[in-house]
């Protein structure tokens, strides 16, 4: 397995171009199964999960090409089963189920894999599809969905806010008979982006970005061209990289209005931040950040996917900061690894108490999930000496060329090929 070797400490400064959002690109790729005509999707990041999704769409019979943009023609889809060998590495594959059953009346997806963060069950996806009239069976490790004729619109109240299940229900409802209302819907920018993509193909969706989404079913969706929004988590990660190294950065191709909660906390930490239409700049003026208190919650509150990065910020900041995780359990796996580098932290239930230290020391550490591993790489950039981050396949699932982008900011980082 590949590793990163990082030599520190460095002050990170310069410009970085933000990639398209993984968490919008994946649902949009699967939503393309609903279209009877070709679609072109621009600004799709080059990531392992994206490659896996494209492979899966090809196996289902779609024509998939990448030349800058991703081109998908799902008019000839004739296989309705997403097999275990592709699904096992990526839980996003569950998003194939809604479009398959909505357009073809049947779909099967192997129970998914991906990051091992707490309980992320597929029951909310299943309940939603059942409420739209699908029959669901769990057999031999597969979720099997079927319907006679078309799905039927329904008034669905989500038990809890779920990005994944909101996507599944919204996609399936676009081709259902009648109107579907999703109450307690997720409000994330990536949900809005997926809805806007579907609208570009002819879907009738309103209320995306609020907790009540209305979908009027149509008989079919056509083709179109759509550009995926910038990745707010990648943007936030690079802003934190500059903040903890007391540097300055400009993030290009960013979307500042998707990051309000993160920018507010960075300002609290002492960062000087400016925003334009598609850029964000951060300057620490050489100062050490101040500790901040953070509580994760669904959008528009502070995103759980930025929690590990802010844990690291607090661990090198002035003072003591509290980080409370309310979205996923078991999401502090980076804390013991950072402690190996000299960080001082205690975990109490779903809160990390971070006591800022002046410097971290390089160590051998292991990535456990996507965002935790990014925080370990950033820690290596500011630690004294050499840090080796193992199991970086997690990072490759969510960050496009992170080492090249960090190197352009002055980091001393190299990828060491595994045996």
Curated annotation (Swiss-Prot):
UDP-N-acetyl-alpha-D-glucosamine binds at residues 91, 120-124, 160-163, 305, 327. It holds the Pfam family EPSP_synthase. The active site is at 115 (proton donor). InterPro entries: Enolpyruvate_Tfrase_dom, Enolpyruvate_Tfrase_sf, MurA_subfamily, RNA3'P_cycl/enolpyr_Trfase_a/b, UDP_GlcNAc_COvinyl_MurA. GO terms for biological process: cell division; cell wall organization; peptidoglycan biosynthetic process; regulation of cell shape; UDP-N-acetylgalactosamine biosynthetic process. One of its GO terms (cellular component) is cytoplasm. Pathway: Cell wall biogenesis; peptidoglycan biosynthesis. CDD domains: UdpNAET (cd01555). It is an enzyme of class 2 (transferase). It catalyses: phosphoenolpyruvate + UDP-N-acetyl-alpha-D-glucosamine = UDP-N-acetyl-3-O-(1-carboxyvinyl)-alpha-D-glucosamine + phosphate. Its main location: cytoplasm. The keyword Cytoplasm applies. The keyword Cell membrane does not apply. Belongs to the EPSP synthase family. MurA subfamily. HAMAP family: MurA. Cell wall formation. Adds enolpyruvyl to UDP-N-acetylglucosamine. This is UDP-N-acetylglucosamine 1-carboxyvinyltransferase. It comes from Salmonella arizonae (strain ATCC BAA-731 / CDC346-86 / RSK2980).
């Amino acid at each position: 397995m590949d590793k990163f070797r990082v030599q520190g400490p460095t002050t990170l400064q310069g410009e970085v171009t933000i990639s398209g959002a993984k968490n919008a690109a994946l649902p949009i790729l699967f939503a393309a199964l609903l279209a009877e005509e070709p679609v072109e999707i621009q600004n799709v990041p080059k990531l392992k999960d994206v490659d896996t999704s494209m492979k899966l769409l090809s196996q289902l019979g779609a024509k998939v090409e990448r030349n800058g943009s991703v081109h998908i023609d799902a008019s000839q889809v004739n296989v309705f089963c997403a097999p275990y060998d592709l699904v096992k590495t990526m839980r996003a594959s569950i998003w194939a189920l809604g479009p398959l059953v909505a357009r073809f009346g049947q779909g099967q997806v192997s129970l998914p894999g991906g990051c091992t963060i707490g309980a992320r069950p597929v029951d909310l996806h299943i309940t939603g599809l059942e409420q739209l009239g699908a029959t669901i069976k769990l057999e031999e490790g597969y979720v099997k969905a079927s319907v006679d004729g078309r799905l039927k619109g329904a008034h669905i109240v989500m038990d809890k806010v779920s990005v994944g299940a909101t996507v599944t229900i919204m996609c399936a409802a676009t081709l259902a008979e009648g109107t579907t209302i999703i109450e307690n819907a997720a409000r994330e920018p990536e949900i809005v982006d997926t809805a806007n993509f579907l609208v570009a193909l002819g879907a009738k969706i309103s209320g995306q970005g609020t907790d009540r989404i209305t979908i009027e079913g149509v008989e079919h969706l056509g083709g179109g061209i759509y550009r995926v929004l910038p990745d707010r988590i990648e943007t936030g990660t690079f802003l934190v990289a500059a903040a903890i190294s007391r540097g300055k950065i400009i993030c290009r191709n960013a979307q500042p209005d998707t990051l309000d909660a993160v920018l507010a906390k960075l300002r609290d930490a002492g960062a000087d931040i400016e925003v334009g239409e598609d850029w964000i700049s951060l300057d620490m003026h050489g100062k050490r950040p101040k500790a901040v208190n953070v509580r994760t919650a669904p959008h528009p509150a502070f995103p759980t996917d930025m929690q590990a990065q802010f844990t690291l910020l607090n661990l090198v900041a002035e003072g003591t900061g509290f980080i409370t995780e309310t979205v996923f359990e078991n999401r502090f796996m980076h804390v013991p690894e950072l402690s190996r580098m000299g960080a001082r932290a205690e975990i109490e239930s779903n809160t990390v108490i971070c006591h800022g230290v002046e410097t971290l020391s390089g160590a051998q550490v292991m990535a456990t999930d996507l965002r935790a591993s990014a925080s370990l790489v950033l820690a290596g950039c500011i630690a004294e000496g050499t840090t080796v981050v193992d199991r970086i396949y997690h990072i490759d699932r969510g960050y496009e060329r992170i080492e090249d982008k960090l190197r352009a900011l002055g980091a001393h980082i190299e990828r060491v090929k595994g045996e």
